[in-house]
């Protein structure tokens, strides 16, 4: 078996992985793009979601005890005390960004295909409604740029100098169904997804 673990992230709905910045007065949040203007899920975010999923599998007894810490490291802060964790560890795995397939990325990056790149994005708006009157509250309109559904690819491999425990790929695969959404506003319906391992031929 290869030392790496490849997976697909199938986005089922609009999703938003943002920069925390807006675009002036029109949009309050814009999508983070790579160097050619394409959307992606940052590896750091994906790693955090996988870490939580493995933690659940560990708590339920489906994977080896201590696997979450070995693969993904310890928290920077102790959740119980709020103090820095002692000692903090980075974990054994490196998680790449989840991006569009290489061939599609190369095609979309062509200068003549700018209109297709723009077609990957939409603008959505929301507002707060007064529960008594049923009327929109003043100055509550918010605009967000989102990305259309698509399938992304990511790769997970050992960090240089680290040796994960034998069988880590199969144990990690057990946790993938527990990641149900990615990006911002996951609890409000954005970013529903299915994570699946890429089977080697």
Region roles according to the model:
Residues 1-121, 136-201:
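RNA-binding basic/glycine-rich loop and surface signature characteristic of RAMP-family CRISPR effectors
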Residues 129, 134-135:
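Intrinsically disordered, low-complexity linker/loop segments enriched in Gly/Pro
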């Amino acid at each position: 078996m290869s030392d790496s673990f490849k997976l697909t992230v199938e986005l089922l709905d609009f999703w938003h992985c943002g920069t925390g910045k807006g675009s002036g007065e029109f949009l309050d949040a814009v999508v983070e793009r790579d160097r050619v203007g394409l959307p992606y899920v940052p590896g750091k975010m994906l790693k955090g979601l996988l870490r939580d999923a493995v933690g659940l599998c560990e708590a339920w007894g489906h994977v080896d005890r201590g696997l979450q810490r070995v693969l993904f490291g310890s928290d920077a802060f102790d959740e119980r005390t709020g103090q820095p964790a002692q000692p903090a560890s980075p974990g054994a795995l490196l998680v790449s960004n989840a991006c569009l397939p290489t061939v599609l990325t190369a095609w979309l990056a062509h200068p003549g295909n700018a209109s297709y790149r723009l077609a990957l994005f939409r603008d959505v708006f929301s507002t707060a409604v007064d529960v008594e009157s049923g009327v929109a509250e003043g100055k509550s309109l918010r605009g967000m740029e989102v990305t259309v559904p698509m399938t992304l690819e990511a790769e997970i491999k050992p960090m240089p100098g680290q040796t994960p425990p034998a069988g880590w790929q199969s144990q990690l695969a057990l946790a993938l169904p527990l990641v149900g959404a990615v990006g911002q506003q996951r609890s409000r319906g954005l970013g529903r997804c299915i994570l699946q391992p890429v089977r080697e031929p």
